[in-house]
C-alpha cells in the first residue's frame, strides 16, 4: 500500500516491534508469493477498487452473526441459564444494521421475546467496560436478572488504501474477534465492584473513528501512549496500585501497554495476560479486554483484587475494579 520507500521502511520497523504474532480476520488472506489483484482471497479488497461503506455493511450483516453464534456457544449455557437471561447487551463499533445482532442472539438462543436488548455502539475499545457497568447496574436493581453480553468487532472490514503512515500503522494492530459473558448476582467468577472514567478532553483528536464513503476511518495518533501514561500517572490508581493483584489492561498495542506499565510503575510481569492476548490475537477493539479477563479468571485465587482498563476516543480510559470470588 505504501509506495514511499522511506515510509515502507518505517512500517517494516514498526511491524518488527509490534509484538503481535498472529491476528484473525473473517476474510481469508492471500497466501504465497507473486502479484495479486486483491489483498484477500475473497477478492473483497481489490487493488484500486476498494468497496464502499454500503458494501462493507452488507458483508458485516452476512458475516457477523456467525461469529456471534460461535462466541455465545462457547459459554455452553445450560437450559436453566438460558431461561434466566433477561437482558442482552451488545457492543460493536465496526458495523451496524437493524434488526441487528441483539435480535440475532435472541433468535439463536430461543430467548423470550420480552428480553430487554441494548446496543452500545461506536464507543470503540472501551465499550466492554461500559457494558459491564450497565450490566452491574441492571443486576443490582434486579437481583434475579441475567445479562448476556456480546462484544463483537470486525476491524478488518475497514481496511483502507492510503499513503497516510499513521493510518496504515493502525491497521497493523487491529483484528477481528468476539467475546460473550454472563453477568448475574451469583457469587462466581469475578465480582464487579466499581467503575470510573478518566478523560482528557484536550487530547480528543488523538483517536477518532468516523464513517466515510469507503468504510470507517481510523486515526490513532502516535502521541496516544505518552498522553495515556501521563493521564494515568495523575490518577488515584498510583496510590492504590499496591492494593491491586490483577491488571487486566486493554492491549491497544505494545506501546500502549508499555506506557501503562511505566505510568503506573507496575512490575515487569503485571501485564503478562494483556501481552499474551496482544501477541495471539492483536487488538480486537471492545472484545479484547474480555479475552484478558477470561485468562485471568482461569488462574485467579479467591479474594484477589483486580483493575480492568480500556482506552478509546476522548482520550478516555474506562476502569473497573473487581475481585475474584
Q: What are the functions of these language-model segments?
A:
Residues 1-59, 146, 155, 159-230, ...:
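Condensing-enzyme catalytic core mediating Claisen C-C bond formation in acyl metabolism
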Residues 83-86, 113-116, 141-147, 168-169, ...:
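Short coil/turn connectors at secondary-structure junctions
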Residues 48-83, 87-89, 93-96:
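Hydrophobic alpha-helical hairpins/lids featuring a short glycine-rich hinge
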Residues 93-94, 112-114, 119-140, 229, ...:
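Claisen-condensing/thiolase-fold acyl-transfer catalytic domains that form or cleave C-C bonds
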Amino acid at each position: 500500500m505504501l509506495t514511499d520507500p522511506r515510509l515502507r521502511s518505517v512500517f517494516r520497523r514498526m511491524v518488527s516491534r509490534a509484538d503481535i504474532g498472529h491476528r484473525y480476520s473473517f476474510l481469508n488472506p492471500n497466501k504465497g508469493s507473486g502479484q495479486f489483484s486483491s489483498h484477500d482471497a475473497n477478492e473483497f479488497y481489490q487493488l484500486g477498487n476498494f468497496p464502499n461503506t454500503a458494501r462493507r455493511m452488507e458483508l458485516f450483516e452476512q458475516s457477523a452473526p456467525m461469529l456471534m453464534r460461535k462466541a455465545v456457544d462457547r459459554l455452553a449455557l445450560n437450559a436453566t441459564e438460558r431461561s434466566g437471561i433477561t437482558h442482552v447487551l451488545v457492543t460493536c463499533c465496526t458495523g451496524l444494521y437493524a434488526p441487528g445482532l441483539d435480535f440475532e442472539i435472541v433468535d439463536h438462543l430461543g430467548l423470550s421475546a420480552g428480553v430487554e436488548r441494548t446496543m452500545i455502539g461506536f464507543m470503540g475499545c472501551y465499550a466492554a467496560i461500559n457494558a459491564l457497568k450497565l450490566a452491574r447496574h441492571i443486576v443490582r436493581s434486579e437481583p434475579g436478572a441475567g445479562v448476556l453480553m456480546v462484544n463483537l468487532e470486525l476491524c478488518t472490514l475497514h481496511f483502507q488504501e492510503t499513503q497516510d503512515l499513521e493510518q496504515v500503522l493502525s491497521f497493523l494492530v487491529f483484528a477481528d474477534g468476539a467475546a460473550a459473558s454472563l453477568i448475574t448476582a451469583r457469587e462466581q467468577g469475578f465480582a464487579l465492584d466499581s467503575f470510573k472514567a478518566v478523560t482528557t478532553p484536550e487530547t480528543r483528536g488523538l483517536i477518532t473513528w468516523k464513517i466515510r464513503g469507503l468504510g470507517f476511518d481510523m486515526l490513532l495518533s502516535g502521541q496516544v501512549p505518552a498522553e495515556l501514561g501521563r493521564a494515568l500517572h495523575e490518577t488515584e490508581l498510583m496510590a492504590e496500585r499496591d492494593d491491586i493483584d490483577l491488571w487486566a489492561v486493554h492491549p491497544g498495542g505494545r506501546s500502549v501497554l508499555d506506557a501503562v506499565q511505566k505510568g503506573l510503575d507496575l512490575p515487569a510481569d503485571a501485564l503478562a495476560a494483556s501481552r499474551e492476548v496482544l501477541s495471539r490475537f492483536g487488538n480486537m477493539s471492545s472484545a479484547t479486554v474480555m479475552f484478558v479477563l477470561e485468562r485471568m479468571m482461569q488462574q485467579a485465587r479467591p479474594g484477589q483484587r483486580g483493575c480492568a482498563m480500556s482506552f478509546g476516543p476522548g482520550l478516555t480510559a474506562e476502569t473497573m475494579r473487581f475481585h475474584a470470588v
